[in-house]
Amino acid sequence: NIKMANDYSDGLLLSIQADVSNLKDEPPKTPEVTNLVQTISFSDMNRWEVAYILKEGKLEKVYKSFKYPSYEISQLQKESLFGLSSKASLTQKDGMIPMLRMPNIVNGEIDCSQLKYLPKSSATTANEPDKWLLKKGDFLINRTNSKELVGKSAIFNLDGDYTYASYLIRYRFDTSLVLPEYVNILFMLPLVRKQIDAVSRQTAGQCNINSDEIGAIRIPVPSIPIQQEIIKKYFDAKDGANNYYAKADECKTNALINFEKEIF
């Protein structure tokens, strides 16, 4: 049942990608070796510059596959802000609020199972009392993590006061152009993951992507009604995958109960 749920989820994401893009995954080509040694000048080694990646055509296929007008994230955002670097506590005391961190972004959603807390006053300033307080609809993206998890995102839709840690960046979009739930879905698709993989850098065992690189990520942006249809398609189908996972958990529990009966 878990495999069926995973296949269901993967199929859903590829189906949504087909709605907005003609991108098809192809097996990597093995480069032809013509020389054992090749001299490369230092000026050609700007590996992590977006311009270099574009020049080499690494992502042109992705951009050309879009079925709708292409926008950079920086063109869609109204504002963005790095999170707090304040030390958080495992125990919530009076005046403290939850701080969302890297482990709290799981499969495109907020997971509240490993929360830490810090004083609400740490998330405010005299001039901006709500500066680091999250609002419903905020888009959170993980800027530092493993290669597979860097760039993972989620939409904040919880009740109450929450803030977020420095390894996350919070975006607020111009909702007359794009809906945050739509952006979040696209950040789970290969057409965005390929862009993140191309620009992320590994240092000290962690991969990083900065705000400029996130801002340069391009996505296809259809009309708001079409975005709403895609969002509905995602959540309606996601319920089906969740049913598979629930059934798998039920089977696992029953198997353990039966095992204990046989042993004891």
Predicted regions mapped to residue ranges:
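Short, basic/aromatic beta-hairpin or loop at an interaction surface
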Residues: 106-120, 142, 162
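Low-complexity, Lys/Gly-biased intrinsically disordered segments
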Residues: 60-110, 129, 202
